[in-house]
Amino acid sequence: MKRNVFYGALLVLLLGFLVRENRLIHITKQVEKTEESAEWQPEWYEQMAEEINDSPITLEVDGTMVDPQLGSLRMSQDGQFMIPYGMLPDTLSCAALLYDGNRLVMERGNTHAEMTVGSPELLLGEESQTIAAPPEWENGILYVSLEAVTEVFSYEENWDAENRKMELTGSEDPATFLPESYDYRKAGRAPAVKNQGSLGTCWAFASVMALESRVRPEWNVSFSEDHMSLRNSFHFSQNAGGEYTMSMAYLLAWQGPVLEEEDPYGDGYSPDGLSPACHVQEIQVLPEKDYEAVKRAVYLYGGVQSSLYTAMVSDRDNTHYYRKETGAY
């Protein structure tokens, strides 16, 4: 009986040894180096990209975590990290403007760079460079090479694979991020000049044109001041005047904006059943008289609306600032 137990135990040990040795041999074969296995195979990038893109990537810029609601990086099929161009103003404090749906212009301070969708060329100032991953559209979002962006604006990249975090560290002084001068007309961001006439709709014109400048040059559109001033929830006449909180309420309630062609200005009539041309997701209210914040907002995002409070009772009055002959301040 004891001998049978002994042989049984010996058989188990022998089988265990064979299984272990076979596993060791299998592992050895996996890591055995050959000329063929030393080359990085394209399908490996695809597998890695699929795994990395399976959940959001955390982005940290100069030690500050980027709000994930702004968007997320992704990896292309050839192993390049890509960033939505719409994230650039908030994350890297640069203007990012899309012309004709395919030409991306990035600016910060005195730095000017251009890329074209599908093209490997990066134009940095007057110098042309080749980038590994051209800008590409994915699910309606334009992605640009993170490597190209960090090259343009002098950032160091560090990929923390364990925590799925990309860390960017800049070397430029934030005080140099704004240019010495900036002209919306030259940048193609200035909306067309409009005529308010004699109605008390200055607040609507200011809000609508600030919004128009926000979506330019990607979307050259004219929104309706008539709809904002007649179809808001305050039910004032167009001669009653208004102010910025009324336009904020109208836009954030998604009552508008509608297109100017659907509701032209000045006829006193606004048709029923018009749908918003876009949905405003966020409005920033800047600190009073913070002129640097105003400059930054104009450069990165679009025109700003300002409010003027006065003791004037009507437009028939004259003050230091208002001239009834011209109807202007």
Residue ranges and their predicted role:
Residues 1-11, 21:
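N-terminal Sec-pathway targeting helices
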Residues 1-3, 28, 32, 185, ...:
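Generic cytosolic/nucleocytoplasmic N-terminal low-complexity/intrinsically disordered segments
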Residues 2-5, 60, 181, 261:
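Intrinsically disordered, low-complexity peptide-like regions
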Residues 6, 13-15, 26:
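N-terminal intrinsically disordered, low-complexity tails enriched in polar/charged
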Residues 14-22, 214:
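Hydrophobic membrane-targeting alpha-helices
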Residues 20-180:
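Primary recognition of N-terminal secretory signal peptides and signal-anchoring hydrophobic helices
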Residues 172-329:
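Catalytic-core signature of thiol
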